Amino acid sequence: MPLPEPSEQEGESVKAGQEPSPKPGTDVIPAAPRKPREFSKLVLLTASDQDEDGVGSKPQEVHCVLSLEMAGPATLASTLQILPVEEQGGVVQPALEMPEQKCSKLDAAAPQSLEFLRTPFGGRLLVLESFLYKQEKAVGDKVYWKCRQHAELGCRGRAITRGLRATVMRGHCHAPDEQGLEARRQREKLPSLALPEGLGEPQGPEGPGGRVEEPLEGVGPWQCPEEPEPTPGLVLSKPALEEEEAPRALSLLSLPPKKRSILGLGQARPLEFLRTCYGGSFLVHESFLYKREKAVGDKVYWTCRDHALHGCRSRAITQGQRVTVMRGHCHQPDMEGLEARRQQEKAVETLQAGQDGPGSQVDTLLRGVDSLLYRRGPGPLTLTRPRPRKRAKVEDQELPTQPEAPDEHQDMDADPGGPEFLKTPLGGSFLVYESFLYRREKAAGEKVYWTCRDQARMGCRSRAITQGRRVTVMRGHCHPPDLGGLEALRQREKRPNTAQRGSPGGPEFLKTPLGGSFLVYESFLYRREKAAGEKVYWTCRDQARMGCRSRAITQGRRVMVMRRHCHPPDLGGLEALRQREHFPNLAQWDSPDPLRPLEFLRTSLGGRFLVHESFLYRKEKAAGEKVYWMCRDQARLGCRSRAITQGHRIMVMRSHCHQPDLAGLEALRQRERLPTTAQQEDPEKIQVQLCFKTCSPESQQIYGDIKDVRLDGESQ
């Protein structure tokens, strides 16, 4: 109900037992200002000995909501007074017909609760005037917010919240996204997200027990992040316990997600994990498989298993028993594959537990289940088991004391070596399974992991694991088998001499113009790349120029070629290298005739040019006694000619693609001769010339002209 003004209180009489109000004209010294306390509600009691019809009745109580933050200083300084009963009739006595209307006027002045929406990461967004703000920082009781479109649109909108107050600092450079905001609000109203886990089904507007739950004051409509649904066995069965848990869960909603007690939300369903073929773990959530990405503290980050296959961007974060899914999936869950993995997990656990001995019914039914082949191709799911002969050999190794059956002898004769392996040209091994070739990746204990040989070339994701004589294939191939290449490897395996190619005297090598070595094999030239132990690795000489990917490996006198060439051999260049090899004077200059001294010319920057056959070379580098030169027109004309000098010897590597610049060479030679002519002149004459060149015109008139000085100098 409205309070009387201070001016009206001065003229009214006070209640017995209170000090009289000061008279008009008297100075009133207010008390020291105090920090106003925040009261959610003020209760005003009116004492009256009359009932509704004037007969005595109990005092009535009227609840009025006041926000002391919005009140003025006069209201805060004044004291709430209770008027005497005699004067209450027309002033203080509330109208019983409309108590709610008078209270609503005060409610309108009170600040409304701020609206918050949850983010997929468990945070919250502030909603002000249909704009979304994300939290930037918090200093004391102030929370600073910036526009959600700050990074995308460069919006500089800012807001500061303090309690229930919100202050907007800067305007926005864009219109509010009404549709996106409404979509977020609709998402907030989903029944599955209304309450945290462990509270059973949502109960609508009425709480447990039929009571209407009042909304929490000062708490926006943001909920906790998505939680896993509780199992039916964990739902509370007694209604009394549900009535006790519901208010506590509602009170937890007023806390930020990081400060909510996990114990207060009840126990969650344990997470489901499945083992990967590499010994890792898959997270199973809503029939989707997630593979582990990283762990930060107690949080583990997961990505969808089909991220690379379908480009799915779904992510999940686990913290203890809580799961938060960040984005939705762009595909349907693979129910058949998930069920196959679950069966495989159960079978492996049963076999490892060893509850039933070998040869029992369970062992017969689950034999080889750990080698299930899970094919993720476009066709239906196929589950196959290894051949009985492989299992029989494992039993022979594990139980050597048991007698062997005749059929087991036949199986061993049919497959005496287990899985088929072929040697690679580098000395490694290929696994052959169903006409597909697998390259060894790593070994962990008794297990050896293999990848498809065409993984890099065709992006095949098929994997295989061998454990003893057992083979487990993880994924199907995206290509048909290379029967021709497989047959070539088998033929090479049968004829080892073909792998040890080369002449009886060893491989042929030719010296490079720079002093290195070329490997010659089948008229192709290979450049040395690196050496590892006894093996030397070579690459095709035309790799950079023609993109040839052929490789060769030499080990002693053995030569192994990895890939074919994409070009014919350069017979002319090979013959030129062989001719140079036969004439050592071209490379070493060991002729008995005296060597002619090399010609050098100075550059304008103080360097040197090498002159050879009227061509100019610029110095590139020096290594020991050798100096390497490149053609001066390399940048201008793209000439690739090179030269090497060692003492007075010179060796040219490549020919020039242009004619020599005779005019430029002659100009450089003339410039080389000019300083010698100038040095032969009189030094005093040179100094006088330089002095007169730098003198002012007035000085030149006094001392004469430059020509006169030259004449005088010549006459002297």
UniProtKB/Swiss-Prot annotation:
GO terms for molecular function: DNA binding; transcription coactivator binding; transcription corepressor activity; zinc ion binding. Induction: Up-regulated by ultraviolet (UV) light (at protein level). The keyword DNA-binding applies. The modification Phosphoserine is found at S21, S261, S371, S503, S591, S696. A zinc finger (FLYWCH-type) spans 116-174, 273-331, 421-479, 509-567, 600-658. InterPro entries: FLYWCH_N, FWCH1/FWCH2, Znf_FLYWCH. Disulfide bonds: none annotated. GO terms for cellular component: cytosol; nuclear body; nucleoplasm; pericentric heterochromatin; transcription regulator complex. GO terms for biological process: DNA damage response; negative regulation of transcription by RNA polymerase II. Residues 1-35, 191-231, 377-421 are annotated as: Disordered. It comes from the Eukaryota. There is a cross-link at K134, K393, K685 (Glycyl lysine isopeptide (Lys-Gly) (interchain with G-Cter in SUMO2)). Its main location: nucleus. It is found in: Nucleus; Chromosome, Centromere. Residues 195-204 have a biased composition (Low complexity). Keywords: Centromere, Chromosome, DNA damage, DNA-binding, Isopeptide bond, Metal-binding, Nucleus, Phosphoprotein, Repeat, Transcription, Transcription regulation, Ubl conjugation, Zinc, Zinc-finger. Transcription cofactor. Negatively regulates transcription activation by catenin beta-1 CTNNB1, perhaps acting by competing with TCF4 for CTNNB1 binding. May play a role in DNA-damage response signaling. Binds specifically to DNA sequences at peri-centromeric chromatin loci. Interacts with CTNNB1 (when unphosphorylated), perhaps preventing interaction of CTNNB1 with TCF4, and thereby regulating transcription activation; phosphorylation of CTNNB1 may inhibit the interaction. This is FLYWCH-type zinc finger-containing protein 1. It comes from Homo sapiens. The lineage of its organism: Eukaryota, Metazoa, Chordata, Craniata, Vertebrata.
